[in-house]
């Protein structure tokens, strides 16, 4: 798929802040807020041998096949570290990885798969962030990334665990309506994982992993590969 360099304005996906009840620590145990529990992990084991790790300053890490490029998706060489890029996910992301850059000659940023992690923790509950991001991307797939639109149902977020930390996961598919150009696949996949954390003020926040990938035609990355990339998200125990 191809994306213009100014695809979306950074920070355009904004989750609603959930109301919080302050707990004084005094009174019965029944007054204590319920601690969120992690769901099942997506990974059935470690990443495949030979894959390269992509590390985020937030402590999250994921793994990609050895042939993928790691770094700024626009190919910018930053001497002072990775300032982050908005490649169309609606987030400024760091720890980006891209598969099959430039496969389409029609111009803009073309790729088969692109992955990144939000540059900072985003305010609000993780579930709300995952669902808000998915709804916004569904709208972008329908209105911005396709010529005649797309049918993009958005499933509910499901509870998962990332290294034992509660997280919420949404995987959606946009079925592209004809006609479509040579850079638009029949199906556009978009995955979001929002990992629960806390902001500097102690309020709920989340770190967001996003992945966009082509499906449904020759030359795309295998579904098994994409699933393994998503499942590899974890906290880096070396930091």
Regions found by a protein language model. Give the residues of each.
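Short, well-structured beta-strand
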Residues: 161-237
